[in-house]
Amino acid sequence: MSTQIEDQDWKSKLNIPKKDTRPQTEDVLSTKGNTFEDFYLKRELLMGIFEAGFEKPSPIQEESIPVALAGRDILARAKNGTGKTAAFVIPTLEKVKSKHNKIQALIMVPTRELALQTSQVVRTLGKHCGISCMVTTGGTNLRDDILRLNETVHILVGTPGRVLDLASRKVADLSECNLFIMDEADKMLSRDFKSIIEQILVFLPKNHQSLLFSATFPLSVKEFMVNHLHKPYEINLMDELTLKGITQYYAFVEEKQKLHCLNTLFSKLQINQAIIFCNSTNRVELLAKKITDLGYSCYYSHARMKQQERNRVFHEFRQGKVRTLVCSDLLTRGIDIQAVNVVINFDFPKTAETYLHRIGRSGRFGHLGLAINLINWNDRFNLYKIEQELGTEIQAIPATIDKSLYVANDNSAVPVPFPIEQSHVQPSMQQQHMPLPPQQPIPNQQFGGMPQQYSPQQQQYQQYPPQGMAMPPQGIQMQQQPQF
């Protein structure tokens, strides 16, 4: 009798975080009403799911988890920010046997930051399961990875080049890896990675199960499906490509006035955290310097930085130590930072696919977000083309933007991100003190009817973080570029 009572009360003993009370869209709410318990998952996994703050499965999780548990190959297409990572991590943790000390699942992702994030989702959801997860990416010490693989690893998360290197050296034994997963499958099967993926598959058992997840499925994915998947179960939840919770605006502005416009946006928008995208690494560094010159705290990240510095920037931005991150398309793939409510395309992207992934960094998991695009005369054809391809309307920016479109009523409801394993992160950046700029207008430039001046709200914003400003990582030499 006491055992039955204990079985009924196990949920009440969990350390469940504060409920996320922010409004959500039907991107994550239009489900069939199933719960995680309906999937008959093991108790230890359910404990990790609920302690991570998950309440009910999203549509992609509801569709894919039971099919994956049944052992079928899956080709799943769903919007960015709707819970795809948990959709494959949960069945992976359920299928992996903790007492079998072999690599049983391989999760492939295109970027190092996404590998770190995915591994932490595995560790967070599986913290009661006794399952070991290792992340391996290029740009890190190969010897360290070899030493770690001498210990028990059940789930390997990595980028293609490093995984192939370890498998070719016979350091990573994939002979009993019966579960192969590709997140951002469209990127994984692009020309950059396809040949490497084909080589990795040679090391896996022939009858392995494959799970492919992405927001877009080009022809390369269909070719892979024909050649390597066995009667895959296809899931398509893309009635439209863009997230319903993201409001999109554009503003025509001359190149030399973009910085003024950005400064106005900083002063007028209620930014929780923002990501600003540029089309080149040189422009990323230059814009980050200009933003800090204006008195705002700012980090930057791009592919030419050392991996430890990229990890540090990613970790501290996720932890909310700075509000603004300037980056290239390095962080367009799968990166989930719940506190980001504004995305600004300082440089307008060239393709609809890039645009879709960029704006998907806001409005995560059905919440509200704002995407603002600074458009010059040369971008007007791209703007029209992207609207047509995505079937969406990007509106002209109004004089004032309704805060209810992108700001949660209760900012404390934003969940704390999964922690990044400290072994992958360098010590915190040394903050530097800088006086606030004077409260005076910036030269006569107006944008969308909004005057260029430092408001009390902007001064409060400039004081974040309280102890000063965060410069771009130390040791990175700024590139010489023309002024904006």
UniProtKB/Swiss-Prot annotation:
Composition bias, Basic and acidic residues: 8-25
Comp. bias regions, Low complexity: 442-484
Spans traversing the lipid bilayer: none
Motif (Q motif): 34-62
Gene Ontology CC: one annotated term: P-body
Organism: Vanderwaltozyma polyspora (strain ATCC 22028 / DSM 70294 / BCRC 21397 / CBS 2163 / NBRC 10782 / NRRL Y-8283 / UCD 57-17)
InterPro entries: DEAD/DEAH_box_helicase_dom (IPR011545), Helicase_ATP-bd (IPR014001), Helicase_C-like (IPR001650), P-loop_NTPase (IPR027417), RNA-helicase_DEAD-box_CS (IPR000629), RNA_helicase_DEAD_Q_motif (IPR014014)
GO molecular function, one term: RNA helicase activity
Cellular location(s): Cytoplasm, P-body
Motif (DEAD box): 183-186
Lineage of source species: Eukaryota, Fungi, Dikarya, Ascomycota, Saccharomycotina
Protein's name according to its UniProt entry: ATP-dependent RNA helicase DHH1
Start and end residues of each stretch annotated as Disordered: 1-27, 430-484
Entry keywords, A to Z: ATP-binding, Cytoplasm, Helicase, Hydrolase, mRNA processing, mRNA transport, Nucleotide-binding, RNA-binding, Translation regulation, Transport
Free-text domain note: The Q motif is unique to and characteristic of the DEAD box family of RNA helicases and controls ATP binding and hydrolysis.
Main location: cytoplasm
Annotated ranges, domain Helicase C-terminal: 245-405
